[in-house]
């Protein structure tokens, strides 16, 4: 455990924290992480809060009832569904399929002719050395695209490879809605962000998941906050979602690489 994690834990100390540590120690890390994320949000640390869209009053969304844990919360799925329904993307690209829950949300809430593309490691692939411990557990427990199959959905294109080796060339300037939720170490997040920026159209939105975490997720937050110095980048209240408008993100990435 890092010294910074110890200080984070001490900053959340209370009798209830101690009680949880004694009664359900396996839940302590998640509890402290949620407390710290909410504190940062309330006092204005990190990215500013802002919603990505304002849906029309007559819009409805569809969310799968099944949720096996891990990945997105129901609140986060609702946000992605609202954005999909409002933005009406022609192409959606997701890095990090996991069980396909968010893939299903994109397919259920997009137009019938929209293209849904999702990328993940091939089944049976071992977790690489770069992955943080939490990612290694998810890689070991995942069942790629199991949710879309259970729902009878078949419109998505499943790509199977490490995102570090992925060639974005076939999708350049064509993606209207992007989600980065693959490996959460800085090397992968930076790689996925650069490639996503190349694939995005000028009128889209890019999301990142697991922003605001501490411990092993802190480098991800630091990377996004450094990127926010070059382009508008926001957090969504009560979630771990961050987002940026694609035009500004593309311009910032181009400036950084030239």
Language-model features: locations:
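Generic secondary-structure transition motif, activating predominantly at the C-termini of alpha-helices
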Residues: 11-14, 22, 26, 36-43, ...
